[in-house]
Amino acid sequence: MSSSREENVYLAKLAEQAERYEEMVEFMEKVAKTVDTDELTVEERNLLSVAYKNVIGARRASWRIISSIEQKEESRGNDDHVSIIKDYRGKIETELSKICDGILNLLDSHLVPTASLAESKVFYLKMKGDYHRYLAEFKTGAERKEAAESTLVAYKSAQDIALADLAPTHPIRLGLALNFSVFYYEILNSPDRACSLAKQAFDEAISELDTLGEESYKDSTLIMQLLRDNLTLWNSDINDEAGGDEIKEASKHEPEEGKPAETGQ
């Protein structure tokens, strides 16, 4: 290997194959911190995103499961169990906070300042919004309000650049619209805003689908499908307030089961 940077990238790939995502994060943090003026390559950027997405995703899933059990025990009046669950949930929340703080510090200190291309700026600002949103999912009171406000600022900054400089079919622009709409729906409880944003992004992409290059066709159409899935889910919720199905977020990999779809990339 010609440099420690290349070696850490290779180690990150090995860690990904071995599903050792905490170590993958460590290797990619080293890469990011060695880049003072240059940007990360697209491959490096994606590796960093995948590493953090997996590390945070496992804890987010754990938190949702524990919170669901807590609600059931509360409804049954099992106060002793509820007390134990609250302590255990607090342990998971400490881990979530540490992970989010780690990537947010890296974004503010290295990644956002060195981003010169519009694509990179949108990618990192979207990522910043995502991890503030993850904090808003479990924080309460003033901390939740602060996390939600930081999410909104990051997503809006990313959106301004995306609308000006990225095509409607660009997977990063689509992923931003997907996650921004999830934020409106889940965190701000604004289903109308969520549906409006998702529908506009989908419609604009559809109108330019014939301009889509082969290299991004798969990513873009996958996110468009997730946008459509969420619109279907949200419109049915608005109509009958049934709820219960999973919203989709943008992710490099398949969306998690049982939640709105969102993207990690």
Curated annotation (Swiss-Prot):
Name of this chain's protein: 14-3-3-like protein GF14 nu
Sequence positions bearing Phosphoserine: 67, 109, 190
Role this protein plays: Is associated with a DNA binding complex that binds to the G box, a well-characterized cis-acting DNA regulatory element found in plant genes.
Gene: GRF7
Disulfide cross-links: none
Family in the record: Belongs to the 14-3-3 family.
Family annotation (InterPro entries): 14-3-3 (IPR000308), 14-3-3_CS (IPR023409), 14-3-3_dom_sf (IPR036815), 14-3-3_domain (IPR023410)
Cellular localization per UniProt: Nucleus; Cytoplasm
Keywords: Cytoplasm, Nucleus, Phosphoprotein
Region annotation Disordered: where it falls in the sequence: 242-265
SMART domains in alphabetical order: 14_3_3 (SM00101)
Modified residues (Phosphothreonine): 211
Record text on subunit structure and interactions: Component of the SERK1 signaling complex, composed of KAPP, CDC48A, GRF6 or GRF7, SERK1, SERK2, SERK3/BAK1 and BRI1. Interacts with DREB1A and DREB1B in the nucleus. Interacts with CINV1.
Organism of origin: Arabidopsis thaliana (Mouse-ear cress)
